[in-house]
Structures are given as structure tokens and as C-alpha cells.
């Protein structure tokens, strides 16, 4: 993990229907780290993540990815930015009528001119990287929840981006399966130098893999730092209360 700032969020504000969700949020993500957007239900963590990838409009501010602003990007600039990251949506969001291999090949079909044989080969390679190559021809319904999440990570990696955004990757998984997914994320970060930005409230997972985190509250950042340090040495009463309350939810997940 280096000190290079691969993502810079500057004074980002987001709102809907007259209600401000995020106000003047600023932080940076360093190359190769696993960065956690942490917060309770309704804190805006998924909104922040989706805004960073250009799905939601912003009221103001910037999201710089390798120095280029995602907010308001259009045309060739937007296309170039979109190729720099992959996304795993909450629940995995695989197409149920497609096999795992076909799901992974879809971005290759839409975004490259590779022949079918090359797309098939690459999709199976990505499945191999997440431990699912033997299940390439299975439908999502024929696999487990943990396998669906792994396949969704593989699809996010299809175009070899340097950054992966994951929205609640451990949601709905039992503790053992969640720990296995954590091990995969850590291995991908270590072996391929991928930078991860993860929205999560699952503290067991956050402690296991998070290099740094921000804790959202009231539309802003209540704290920033290493997850274990925030837990053990909370900078304010809200952070202390959050980490006392949330572990019970994490163990019950």
C-alpha cells in the first residue's frame, strides 16, 4: 500500500427532494489500500459510494479518480473514468438466466472487441482467481450466496480495473462465508494491487480487512482512521457509542 492518492473526494454534497444526505464530505483513498465507508442504516454510505461511481448527481464538490473529476464527466472523459474501476452491487446483482461465466463475460462483450473465444477464456480466468472456475457453467440459483458474491467480484474485475467499489459485500452471509470473502478481498489486494472502496456496516469484516475507514453520521464524517484504532480509542462520544452498539449486529449477521 502506497501513499499515492488514487481517489480524492473534495467537499462533496448530495441531496434529494430538498433533503441533504451528504454535506461537504472530503477524504482520500490511497493506491492499494482497502478503504471502508462505515456507518449505520441511513447514514449515506451507499449513497456516497454510488455518487463516487457516477450513478447519483451531486449538489457540489469533486470526486477525482487519478486526477480527473467524475462529477459531471461526459463523453470520452466519462468512458475513460468508467474503465478504471469495477463495481459489485449489493446482493451481487448477477443475471439469473446466465451462467457464472456468461455473467463475467458480459462486460467484455459490451466494452471490448475481443472474439468470443477470448471472452470465454478470460471469464474463466477471472472465476479461477476467485476460486469458482469449476462452477463456470452453473446458474446463480445453482450456487450459494457466498459463491454469488465471489462471482460478482470476478465480474467487477473483468476489465482489469485498478479500483473495485463493493456495496455491502458481506450482507446476508453467515460469519464463516463472510470471513472467506474477506480472505479473498485481502488476497486480491495483496496479489494484484487492487484498491478497494467498500461500503459496509459489518464490523467483523471491517476489522479483518480495513486499512482505513471513515464513519458517516449526520451527513458528514464523524471519524477517520484505522478501524481498530477508532474502536479502541474513539475520538468522540458518537464514535464510542457506534462501536459499542454495532458489534452485536455484526455477530448476529
Residue ranges and their predicted role:
Residues 206-208:
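A short, surface-exposed alpha-helical micro-motif characterized by mixed small hydrophobic
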Residues 164-167:
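Catalytic Walker B motif of ABC-type/P-loop ATPase nucleotide-binding domains
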Amino acid at each position: 500500500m502506497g501513499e499515492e492518492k488514487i481517489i480524492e473526494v473534495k467537499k462533496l454534497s448530495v441531496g434529494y427532494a430538498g433533503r441533504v444526505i451528504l454535506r461537504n464530505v472530503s477524504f482520500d483513498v490511497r493506491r492499494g489500500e482497502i478503504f471502508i465507508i462505515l456507518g449505520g442504516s441511513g447514514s449515506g454510505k451507499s449513497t456516497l459510494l454510488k455518487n463516487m461511481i457516477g450513478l447519483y448527481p451531486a449538489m457540489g464538490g469533486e470526486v477525482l479518480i487519478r486526477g480527473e473529476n467524475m462529477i459531471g464527466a461526459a463523453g470520452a472523459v466519462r468512458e475513460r473514468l468508467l474503465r478504471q474501476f469495477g463495481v459489485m452491487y449489493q446482493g451481487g446483482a448477477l443475471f439469473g438466466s446466465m451462467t457464472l461465466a456468461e455473467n463475467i463475460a458480459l462486460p467484455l462483450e459490451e466494452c471490448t472487441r475481443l472474439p468470443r473465444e477470448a471472452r470465454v477464456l478470460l471469464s474463466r480466468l477471472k472465476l479461477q482467481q476467485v476460486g469458482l472456475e469449476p462452477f463456470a457453467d452453473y446458474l446463480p440459483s445453482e450456487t450459494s450466496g457466498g459463491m454469488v458474491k465471489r462471482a460478482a467480484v470476478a465480474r467487477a474485475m473483468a476489465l482489469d480495473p485498478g479500483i473495485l467499489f463493493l456495496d455491502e459485500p458481506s450482507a446476508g452471509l453467515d460469519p464463516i462465508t463472510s470471513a472467506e470473502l474477506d480472505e479473498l478481498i485481502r488476497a486480491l489486494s495483496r496479489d494484484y494491487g487492487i484498491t478497494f472502496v467498500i461500503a459496509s456496516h459489518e464490523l467483523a469484516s471491517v476489522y479483518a480487512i480495513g486499512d482505513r475507514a471513515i464513519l458517516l453520521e449526520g451527513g458528514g464524517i464523524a471519524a477517520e482512521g484505522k478501524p481498530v484504532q477508532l474502536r479502541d480509542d474513539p475520538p468522540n462520544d458518537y464514535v464510542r457509542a457506534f462501536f459499542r452498539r454495532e458489534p452485536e449486529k455484526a455477530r448476529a449477521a
